[in-house]
Amino acid sequence: MRIKVLNPEVVMKIAAGEVVSGPSSVVKELVENSLDAQADSITVEILDGGKSLIKVDDNGIGMEEEELELSILPHTTSKIFSIEDLYKLKTFGFRGEALSSISRVSRMKMTSKPPEKEVGTMLEILGGKIIEKKRVNSSNGTKIEIMDLFFNIPARRKFLKSDSAEGRYVTEIIEKFAFTNNINLTYIRDHKEIYKFSSDMDLITKCLKIYPELKRDDLIEIEHNDSLCKISGVISQPKVGRNNRTAQHFFVNNRYIKVASLYSVLETGYGEILEKSIHPYGIIFIEIPPDMVDVNVHPQKLEVKFTDEQMVASLLKKVVRESLKKNTHFTMEFINSNDTIDLNKKTSSFSVQNLYNKNESSQKVDFSQNPTNTDYFENTDEFFNNSEIEDLQEEQNHFDNSYKLYEPSKTFDFKGFEYQKNQTFTPVEKINSLEKLRILGIVAERYLVVEGEDKLLLVDFHAAHERYIYEILRENVYEKGGLTSDLLLTPVIIALDEVRKGIILENKDHLEKLGIKLEEDEKEIIVKGLPSLVKIDDAERLIFEIADDLRISNFDQQPNILDKNLATMACRAAVKTRDNPTGMETLLNTIFEKKLLTCPHGRPIMIQITFKTLDKYFGRI
């Protein structure tokens, strides 16, 4: 007989794997239990990314001896007693799975005492079985220590990421709890206090603590309250954001959720004043009657379903727009705020036209010169070692990747760009390196108008310059082992959030290969050297973007994170709209000589219209 009943121990370990994916999920479950126990002071401590130790200590209502023993049994809970209770839920937990699952895959120590008791109870549990029980002197509340996570499931333990990566995931969880609860919350990692939030700290102060790159004026408070739904929180000014959505967080009834469509609803609220590729900061709280939202649709309770998705979406968009109108000086041109949005529909990021003027000074850029001196092929003597870059593992389930990097071995596919049959300009799919060219001028402060032998070309000079720089950087990295650095006369001091800072420090050697030399200060990163081959005007933004590239990278999906970082560097160094470029002939000749069709991110460098097409248009033939 091939079908057999699984051993109960196997069943429990499989079930535990649904709840406990790693140290961060353990921290999430334990802190939620503390909050459900009415704690207003919680301390979380981890060692080695939570692999060796996770300790959560609270001052909640505690548990008596009998309750403590029951709490580690499967499906035991104080939160619900009937299926109807699911639809009026006001607690984080309800399934009675967390402590049972955690206890079965770790060495656990639990100490708890209700305020009315003189002494507490301590249990030691090994793989789900109580091995010691005794009465102890303890403070009010509950302290749970988790040691050697997955010690009895080696296959699961080996899939944990590095200590630093797992520690980052825990840090992200702590930040979300800090946003949503007015409690005293302390977070200690490897004996170092990372965060200490007090119960009287307002949301903007928390944002500034978690995201030190922000200033108070960068944030706008939002508020709406009616009989069915309350929306509150903070969003950022339209010109303040990241190149991904890692600073957008949504909470429904104080529970952190990941509903993909809400991200697009937030950005739709900005309309056309949101700069292309900028994703705003947003800490959004939605309070709704419990019977209008189902939280029992995901093993880790990260997804929810609304009974009226359209009401929530329209209201959120309206609140964002009204707050922006009140707090910004931009011309607001929005579509109808009552347009329908399906929260269950999978969405992708979008970009909109920028309607405001940037007060950027024009700078002169000379394309006729190499990024620095003419002997750039000889001035690098550092070589890579063959060790892999650590910790650039998958975080794609947390963040979306906004573009696909150009791959030198592949031909660019123009199918992604939609050109109607009756359009006169078409993408350039083939380049004749011997063609004679004549530059006629610049239009719209960003396009070269070029006369070819049988055609007229429009060239995006930012895309062209970006690809030109990328090729030089890539040649130096792959043929000479890395980029040389120029030491800065005045080091750049950068305030980074804990997650970005951790990523940068973990990959310090990787950044040195990119020509970036840095040191750690207690609160900041100090950049002391930048690559010699390119001029970087905004080192802070470059560091932010490299950190984010590393954060969302995956070696399976993104074979070479180094190429992606070089593309980011080239983009930052390339000439921008409204700059005053010189040496355009040199740039154009290089593009044609090397037959470069796209920028490093895959966007076309030029489009064309043949003179024959023009003659037909004007009735000459």
From Swiss-Prot:
PROSITE patterns: DNA_MISMATCH_REPAIR_1
Pfam families with a match to the protein in the record: DNA_mis_repair, HATPase_c_3, MutL_C
Stored InterPro entries: DNA_mismatch_repair_CS, DNA_mismatch_repair_MutL, DNA_mismatch_S5_2-like, HATPase_C_sf, MutL/Mlh/PMS, MutL/Mlh/Pms-like, MutL_C, MutL_C_dimsub
Gene3D superfamilies named in the record: 3.30.230.10, Histidine kinase-like ATPase, C-terminal domain, MutL, C-terminal domain, dimerisation subdomain, MutL, C-terminal domain, regulatory subdomain
Top-level taxon in the UniProt lineage: Bacteria
Tagged with keyword DNA repair: yes
SUPFAM superfamilies: ATPase domain of HSP90 chaperone/DNA topoisomerase II/histidine kinase, DNA mismatch repair protein MutL, Ribosomal protein S5 domain 2-like
Keywords: DNA damage, DNA repair
SMART domains associated with the record: DNA_mis_repair (SM01340), MutL_C (SM00853)
GO biological process, alphabetically ordered: mismatch repair
UniProt key word Lipid biosynthesis: no
Coiled coil region boundaries: none
Molecular function via GO: ATP binding; ATP hydrolysis activity; ATP-dependent DNA damage sensor activity; mismatched DNA binding
Bridged cysteine pairs (disulfide): none
Gene Ontology annotations for the cellular component aspect, listed alphabetically: mismatch repair complex
Summary of the function given for this chain in its UniProt record: This protein is involved in the repair of mismatches in DNA. It is required for dam-dependent methyl-directed DNA mismatch repair. May act as a 'molecular matchmaker', a protein that promotes the formation of a stable complex between two or more DNA-binding proteins in an ATP-dependent manner without itself being part of a final effector complex.
Family under the similarity heading: Belongs to the DNA mismatch repair MutL/HexB family.
Family annotation (HAMAP family): DNA_mis_repair (MF_00149)
The protein's name: DNA mismatch repair protein MutL
